[in-house]
Amino acid sequence: MVLEQVAFDIETTGFNVDDEVTTVGFAVPMGVRVFVQTGERDAPGIESAVESEVSETLVRVSAHASESELLAAVSEFVAERIRDDMLLVAYNGERWNGGFDVPFLRTRYAQRDLAWPFVDVPYADVMPLVTDRFNTTVDGTEQGDLVTAYDVLCDGSYGDLDPFDDSAEAVAAFEDGRFAELVLHNVADVLRTRALGRVAERYCSKSEFKVKSLTPTRSI
């Protein structure tokens, strides 16, 4: 049985241990589900602003006042929607020697003393598949980042959704309260990740996905 992929991606206020998660997005079979925190600021109309820019994909957005509320909402979503016949995938989310999204989330859940949501959830990282099993060399230089890999292997239009030239701009967008732009960037990234995951499904064996469990050793 081939597990149905659910791509996810996060945005943060930075890379330090005390930085926070600002956005979590999932590309589910019916569309994209995004959770964004506003830092206690009013943020009306985010979903409608995003919908006006994304015509071919159903996007649902919920705004949360704080990181704690965002993480709690993500946990509820995972419990209700992510089943054991689905495969959670990310791009540089967590690899054997590093990664970003999963370690960052794990740290924030631990610091908030919240239960880890990804129980009985299989996970695979798309980045090693792309960089090890495909040629992503451009102009003589290997380019393993998400944007370039998507452009090289998928040649699709999801990049047109992204208002940022660099992911670092997501930090400034949160600080400035440009939440619709932040969400659009996240939507573009989860859709690019999903597209690369599907390419890997077409051309790589199941064993090369190196699926692992995210279930913790203890539940309490």
Locations of the language-model features?
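Short, charged N-terminal helix-start/capping segments
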Residues: 1-17, 113-128
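Short alpha-helical "patches" and their helix-cap loops
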Residues: 37-41, 208-216
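Terminal disorder- and signal-encoded targeting elements
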Residues: 1-4, 211-220
